[in-house]
C-alpha cells in the first residue's frame, strides 16, 4: 500500500511540474489542485477497500511463521523430535506415569525390563539394578542359557581365568593365515 501511494505521488509531481507535462487533450483544462486531491482520495479509498477484501491474504503474507509452529485450521500443530514421534492417540491412551518414563532415552548398554514408576533414593537403586539387563558384545557372551552343561558358575570362572592368561590380539583376517603358515613352518 505504501509503495502504491509513493508511485501515485511521484506521478502527480511529475505531471504537475513544469516541463514534465505532456500535451493536454483539447477541451481539457489544467486540473486544479482540489481536483487532484479528490482524485487521490478516491484512489486511496479504492485501494483500502481492496485491501479489506483481501485482508486475510495480506495478513498471511505479512506474518512469517516458524516452520514447526504453523497454524492450520485454527489449531496449532507442532513438529516433534524424530526419535520421539508419537501419534496423539498413542499419547492419550498411555498412562501419565508411563509417558514420562517412555520418553526418556536410556543408556544403550542397559535395557529396562520393567518401568521404574517412581524415583528412589540413590542407595536403593542398587536393588533395582538387578532388574536391568546389561547388554554384552555378541562375541563376548559366555552363556545365554545357564541350564546348559558347560555353563555352571565354576566352568565359567575357569574359562575366564584361561582367557585372561592367554590374551590374544585380534588381527586382520588375511594376516591370520600368514601367521598360521609361519607357525606350521617352524614346527
From Swiss-Prot:
Biased composition (Basic and acidic residues): 60-76, 164-178
Protein name per the record: Pro-thyrotropin-releasing hormone
Principal localisation: secreted
Keyword Acetylation found: no
Keyword Nucleotide-binding found: no
Region of interest (Disordered), residue spans: 49-148, 164-187
Signal peptide: 1-22
GO BP, sorted A to Z: eating behavior; histamine metabolic process; hormone-mediated signaling pathway; negative regulation of glutamate secretion; positive regulation of gamma-aminobutyric acid secretion; positive regulation of insulin secretion
Gene (UniProt): trh
Similarity comment: Belongs to the TRH family.
Compartments it resides in: Secreted
